[in-house]
UniProtKB/Swiss-Prot annotation:
Protein name per the record: Putative pyruvate, phosphate dikinase regulatory protein
Catalytic activity, reaction form: N(tele)-phospho-L-histidyl/L-threonyl-[pyruvate, phosphate dikinase] + ADP = N(tele)-phospho-L-histidyl/O-phospho-L-threonyl-[pyruvate, phosphate dikinase] + AMP + H(+); N(tele)-phospho-L-histidyl/O-phospho-L-threonyl-[pyruvate, phosphate dikinase] + phosphate + H(+) = N(tele)-phospho-L-histidyl/L-threonyl-[pyruvate, phosphate dikinase] + diphosphate
Keyword Transferase: yes
Cystine residue pairs: none
Top-rank taxon, per record: Bacteria
Organism: Clostridium botulinum (strain 657 / Type Ba4)
Ligand binding (ADP): G147, L148, S149, R150, T151, S152, K153, T154
Keyword tags: Kinase, Nucleotide-binding, Serine/threonine-protein kinase, Transferase
Molecular function (Gene Ontology), one example: phosphotransferase activity, phosphate group as acceptor
Length: 269
């Protein structure tokens, strides 16, 4: 099996993301292995030594340290291993355009700066107010997600938190009063999540099956119940006059991008 080694002088997430995106185009015939913290010549030699068949492997590197990066390229050439350096050409191009020498800081994405702590704070916020009955966080949230159960509210909250955005989610259910705080904040912050009824029924039935619920609890995935819930949610969203996004078969990343462009259209995240 062909293997892509995602190599970095930091934790390797960027290299792994590029490697996974590449491997995805070829199905199960390509495997990805992350190799983080390659910071010395010895680390490079150890990496090269574990690649048994150069014809069935390649390296995707985000190593920033110039001497290590160049040594890795040299060893790959000597060993007949294909290598693609992701950051090198980008850094060189920007350096040329700006006529400025780069700082070559490994792991710059994870630098312990204000953005990092903002991300941690947002993660804690999302966890604290996930499907919570405590509505005190609504006025402090950057984004408030509202929608039925299984419309990706929680994954979206966590994804947005990873961008440093405080996201809070409110489940909509006919039996539960809508928080008054929703009517007291800027409606631009509120995002309604809707979904195709048949798709929602399918998702809920799958969840019920996985949780081995007894038949008396199948109301959750009942078609009539789902339609009633969707009608209720639609009524609330129209009353709030908030932006509504259809999440049917939409990736979390795509939905999050739409949300950020809508809420933060006047500033950069």
């Amino acid at each position: 099996m062909f293997k892509i080694y995602a190599v970095s002088d930091s934790i390797g997430e960027t290299a792994e993301q590029v490697a996974n995106a590449t491997a995805y185009q070829f199905g199960s015939s390509v495997k990805v292995e992350r190799v983080p913290y390659v910071k010395t010549f010895e680390d490079v030699n150890n990496l090269i030594s574990i690649i048994e068949n150069p014809n069935e492997a390649m390296i995707i590197s985000t190593i920033v340290l110039v001497d290590i990066r160049e040594f890795l390229v040299q060893r790959c050439v000597e060993s007949g291993i294909h290598i693609s350096n992701v950051l090198g050409p980008c850094i060189s191009l920007v350096s040329t355009i700006l006529n400025k020498t780069p700082e070559y800081k490994p792991g710059a994405v994870w630098d312990m700066d204000k953005k990092y702590y903002k991300k941690i704070e947002a993660m804690e916020f999302a966890i604290r107010y996930d499907d919570s009955k405590d509505h005190s966080g609504i006025k402090h949230a950057d984004i408030v997600l509202i929608g039925l159960s299984r419309t990706s509210k929680t994954p979206l909250s966590i994804y947005l938190a990873n961008k440093g955005i405080k996201a809070l989610n409110i489940p909509l259910m006919p039996e539960v009063p809508v928080p008054e705080e929703l009517f007291e904040i800027d409606r631009k912050k509120i995002i309604g999540l809707t979904i195709d009824p048949m798709h929602l029924i399918e998702i809920r039935r799958h969840r019920v099956d996985n949780m081995m619920k007894i038949p008396t609890e199948l109301k959750y995935a009942n078609a009539e119940r789902v339609l009633d819930e969707l009608e209720f949610a639609d009524k609330i969203m129209r009353k709030l006059k908030c932006k509504v996004i259809d999440v049917t078969k939409r990736a979390i990343e795509d939905t999050a991008l739409i949300i950020m462009e809508s809420v933060f259209s006047d500033r950069i995240i």
